[in-house]
Amino acid sequence: MDIDQYMTDVGRRARRASREIARASTAAKNAALEAVARAIGRDADALKAANARDVARAKDKGHDAAFVDRLTLSDKALKTMIEGLRQVATLADPIGEMSNLKYRPSGIQVGQMRVPLGVIGIIYESRPNVTIDAAALCLKSGNATILRGGSEALESNTALAKLIGEGLAAAGLPQDAVQVVGTADRAAVGKLITMTEYVDVIVPRGGKSLIERLINEARVPMIKHLDGICHVYVDDRASVAKALAVCDNAKTHRYGTCNTMETLLVARGIAPAVLTPLGRLYREKGVELRVDADARAVLEAAGVGPLVDATDEDWRTEYLAPVLAIKIVDGIDAAIEHINEYGSHHTDAIVTEDHDRAMRFLREVDSASVMVNASTRFADGFEFGLGAEIGISNDKLHARGPVGLEGLTSLKYVVLGHGEGRE
């Protein structure tokens, strides 16, 4: 296969389809989503058979249990896909929405209209559920999509793509509006991320090595985040009960997510009251504690152990595991400085009863999501009321934080007049 020619053809067809899908009615888009949902339920056995072949190959290659679990399309996973499609169909359609209309002295009205981005390339690892999630959000937001999943999920993604195409056709929409790259060749990714004439934005969903490669090689703009080095700072004016609840949930609710706390900062004045019960709780749950000298002194005095001495690298590490770095700081100044120096601008939280300090933390911490008296785990499109998300961005341009339907659109200016001319 000539990968360059193949991907160029995919891009050309996506660009053509994007013009049709951009003007599709809400009813047609919702009909397509419902048709895909019904098709998944109808063809569940065929989907599971294709997926079983992917799973068997993954096991033969020695992939671990966590990888295989993400790859597997269980009955529960298929049900979640169907529910997700129907849930996206219930979301308000942002396309064509007018805002900020104002009359100008000249007599014209100036405002903004929300429009699709165009063609979105989604690059992700071997998680077939992303095929449906991404296709649904891009379709509802009026965008064409090129999906390039991990090679281990190729049969699963191909089977899902067939059903998506059927759903689009049933609703009278172009099947090329959602295309799955049908090759495992890595050169396809290299071509996709440089096709500026056909692709408007890339959304990568994957590990750090994938994101780093795309940062270095992509010519198409990206909506992305590299790391989730999230912090909770417990202020010396915090409620101890709230601190324990927030810090427990932020770390132990799920270890492998990008919005899990990786570093705990505690004000010196409240450290014994907070770290003594927290340290015991974390050790009971099997969390390894990597601590600075001050935190070690407090925890050892409380009989908490074993402990590991933290290095500078620990403050820069996204563990995605039951490991937590702990540092005692003098106060909010030091906490904000540490977060802005070592954090990844993803999600950070303060626990405090002091309103002025809370507002200062919100203003000065340079992250996509900043929270007061709440777990970092809330940094999620569903929890934020977006309905669904295609990912989380810690960049500052275009979309920042959880990226839902509006994050897959842009605003253009519109002018309404009555024959006015500029003087």
Curated annotation (Swiss-Prot):
Principal location listed in the UniProt entry: cytoplasm
GO molecular function, one term: glutamate-5-semialdehyde dehydrogenase activity
Enzyme Commission number(s) from the entry: 1.2.1.41
Highest taxon listed in the record's lineage: Bacteria
GO biological process terms, semicolon-separated: L-proline biosynthetic process
Catalysed reaction equations from the record: L-glutamate 5-semialdehyde + phosphate + NADP(+) = L-glutamyl 5-phosphate + NADPH + H(+)
The protein's enzyme class: oxidoreductase
Any Pfam family the entry gives: Aldedh
Family designation: Belongs to the gamma-glutamyl phosphate reductase family.
HAMAP family, per the entry: ProA (MF_00412)
The protein's name in its UniProt record: Gamma-glutamyl phosphate reductase
Species per Swiss-Prot/TrEMBL record: Burkholderia mallei (strain ATCC 23344)
Lineage: Bacteria, Pseudomonadati, Pseudomonadota, Betaproteobacteria, Burkholderiales
Protein encoded by which gene: proA
